[in-house]
């Protein structure tokens, strides 16, 4: 469990938190603890010849939990024969055989791999219509009651604060019923369905009252996207506008979350307001930045009284005066700024983020999709090339499912016309167009369509690299197998994926590596791609070249690094920002509305420029030089 930088009085016991919270560094660690509690309960019940009644959730959060339970069944011989399950919810309408159904989800991730009795499995029926739905809901409540009630209810949480599909406005006494889904919930489901118009707008869900009757409740949440709603639920007032806050009234509830999901809790965000903290350089920087933002003052204008009035007297005691704190933090921030991301050759690098030598460096820039590098660090990428380094662009996945069918059709028209003008056969292009015309709105895309979409995105990446001066022989398309399913649902990361990255690393032997640390979605492609790189590092970490390799994590497509975390800030001039924009433009299939925009409807170049300008503005308001924009990076230290 994470306890660094603060000394908690107990498991989440502080004046801000109204629900017990257990924080783990990673979801992997957290699910092991939850799985052990479930298994202990199952086995205790079995020893008394009793049934164990579990309420189960779907969605991203419980996937790793179910994987751990399956592992315990296979490797430790844990039996689930005495388990009765009731699932929280199901979309309406939803055929059971659909990959998007929770019936399919539960069997795919859990039930097909353990020894549970099929007659003990209960999942809401998404095929029902009209009065059948109400009758089913009444019978579902009766079935839970007949089973003796739920012993342990597992929950996730939606960004609206929904538990199950109990959206804002749900009553604490509500029972199993048909509901209409919130707009944000529908947006979050697009990644599972492929497009908004395929996401159902209704569902069957257990009620808040049904959940509250469970004897024990564990809510799990992973990733930064969940941080705001976790804070609102744990520290906010009870309100039907955030249904999860009703859990504050449950006598036996536990939130189990990872460090990212906990990042906005007061004990993580402002730990000095909770208890005595262990001040390190990053936490001191964070406290001073927050104070500057609150008071709208630059660092060097903060006074003793400002620290004393805002719970930061410890810093005065530690340093002796506000002036000494200010100078230390100002210098700390100033030293993150570098116009030489690859290191300035033959210069004193004692206060620079990157070492001067060797020069030039071999640089690997990993990009989860074929445009993430230019979106997130295009200015830095161009500068590395300009300053003479051997820059390699590495595209981990094809990104093929993010190409609209209409756009590919247009490209096939162009290719067909070229073929006609050159007097060669364009029959293949005509066949692709015919395939596109006959595509069904759901399901995996045909391989021939995916092949051309892959080629299209590769050509766009080559064009962007060519524009920035990266030769084609230094552009690497890995097409990692985990991604190549032809649908939004991906395979699990495997050894084949890791080996591909290991082989490239050992071939190039880079002095510098850049990788996407944009983990807004902890089970999205960015996270999986970073996990693949980290697992590859585990393999090569004893290689001589790796011991002298710096690893930098970038963001920018979805979120930006907070100022207190930044290790290197690269200024971007107006002309360099224009170069970055032009490189992004080369990815034509992603312009005029990306396939998976998330919450932000703007083009990627607009998002990136705003984030880069906001970062420069932060530095300027803290008292640093004024730049047009900045791209920022966090250094990753493997094994530390």
Spell out what each predicted region is.
Residues 65-72, 164-175, 523-539:
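Short Gly/Thr/Asp-enriched flexible loops that form oxyanion-binding sites at enzyme active sites
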Residues 59, 365-374:
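Short, glycine-rich nucleotide/cofactor-binding loops
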Residues 45-50, 145-149, 503-511, 516:
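Glycine-rich phosphate-binding loop signature in dinucleotide/nucleotide-binding domains
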Residues 53, 84, 151-152, 216, ...:
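Structural motif
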Residues 186-194, 198-203, 296, 301-364, ...:
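Metal-dependent de-N-acetylase/amidase catalytic core
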Residues 13-139, 143-146, 391:
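N-terminal active-site beta-alpha-beta segment that forms phosphate/nucleotide-binding
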Residues 2, 6-8, 25, 29-30, ...:
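Conserved phosphate- and dinucleotide-binding cores of soluble alpha/beta proteins
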Residues 65-76, 374-398, 402:
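Histidine-anchored nucleotide/phosphate-binding helix
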């Amino acid at each position: 469990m994470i306890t660094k930088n603060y000394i908690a009085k107990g498991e989440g016991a502080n004046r801000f938190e109204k629900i017990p919270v257990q924080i783990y560094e990673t979801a992997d660690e957290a699910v092991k603890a939850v799985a052990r509690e479930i298994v202990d309960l199952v086995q205790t019940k079995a020893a008394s010849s009793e049934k164990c009644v579990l309420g189960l959730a779907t969605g991203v959060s419980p996937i790793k939990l179910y994987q751990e339970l399956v592992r315990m069944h296979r490797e430790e011989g844990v039996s689930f024969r005495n388990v009765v399950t009731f699932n929280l919810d199901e979309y309406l309408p939803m055929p059971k055989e659909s990959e998007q159904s929770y019936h399919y989800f539960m069997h795919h991730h859990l039930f097909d791999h353990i020894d549970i009795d099929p007659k003990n499995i209960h999942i809401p029926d998404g095929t029902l219509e009209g009065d059948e739905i109400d009758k089913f809901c009444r019978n579902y409540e009766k079935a839970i009651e007949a089973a003796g009630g739920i012993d342990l209810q597992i929950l996730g949480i939606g960004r609206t604060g929904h538990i199950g599909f109990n959206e804002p406005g749900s009553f604490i006494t509500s029972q199993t019923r048909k509901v209409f889904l919130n707009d944000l919930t529908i947006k979050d489901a697009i990644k599972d369905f492929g497009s908004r118009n395929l996401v159902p707008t209704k569902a069957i869900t257990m009620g808040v009252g049904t959940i509250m009757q469970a004897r024990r409740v564990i809510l799990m949440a992973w990733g930064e996207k969940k941080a705001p709603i976790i804070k609102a639920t744990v520290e906010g007032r009870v309100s039907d506008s955030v249904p999860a806050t009703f859990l504050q009234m449950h006598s036996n509830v536990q939130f189990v979350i990872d460090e990212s999901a906990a990042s906005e809790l007061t004990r993580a965000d402002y730990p000095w307001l909770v208890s005595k903290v262990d001040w390190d350089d990053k936490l001191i920087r964070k406290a001073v930045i927050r104070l500057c933002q609150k008071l709208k003052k630059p660092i060097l204008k903060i006074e003793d009284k400002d620290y004393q009035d805002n719970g930061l007297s410890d810093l005065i005691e530690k340093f002796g005066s506000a002036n000494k704190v200010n100078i230390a933090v100002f210098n700390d921030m100033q030293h993150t700024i570098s116009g030489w991301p690859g290191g300035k050759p033959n210069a004193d690098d004692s206060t620079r983020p990157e070492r001067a030598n060797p020069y030039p460096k071999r640089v690997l820039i990993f990009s989860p999709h074929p445009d993430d590098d230019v979106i997130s660090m295009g200015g830095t990428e161009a500068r590395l090339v300009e300053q003479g380094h051997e820059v390699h662009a590495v595209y981990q996945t094809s990104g093929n499912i993010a190409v609209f069918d209409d756009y590919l059709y247009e490209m096939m028209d162009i290719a067909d016309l070229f073929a006609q003008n050159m007097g060669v056969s364009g029959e293949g292009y005509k066949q692709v167009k015919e395939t596109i015309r006959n595509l069904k709105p759901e399901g995996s895309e045909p391989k021939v369509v995916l092949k051309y979409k892959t080629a299209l995105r590769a050509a766009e990446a080559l064009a962007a690299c060519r524009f920035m001066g990266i030769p084609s022989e230094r552009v690497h398309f890995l097409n990692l197998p985990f991604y190549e399913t032809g649908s939004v649902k991906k395979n699990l990361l495997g050894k084949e994926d890791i080996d591909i990255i290991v082989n490239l690393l050992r071939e190039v032997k880079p002095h510098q590596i850049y990788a996407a640390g944009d983990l807004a979605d902890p089970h999205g492609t960015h996270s999986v791609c970073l996990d693949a790189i980290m697992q590859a590092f585990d393999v090569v970490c004893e290689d001589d070249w790796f011991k002298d390799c710096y690893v930098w994590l970038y963001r920018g497509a979805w979120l930006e690094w907070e100022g207190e975390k930044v290790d290197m800030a690269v200024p971007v001039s107006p002309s360099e920002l224009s170069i970055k924009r032009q490189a992004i433009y080369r990815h034509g299939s992603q312009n005029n509305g990306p396939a998976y925009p998330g919450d932000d409807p703007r083009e990627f170049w607009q998002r990136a420029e705003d984030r880069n300008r906001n970062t420069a503005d932060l530095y300027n308001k803290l008292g640093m030089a004024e730049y047009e924009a900045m791209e920022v990076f966090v250094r990753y230290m493997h094994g530390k």
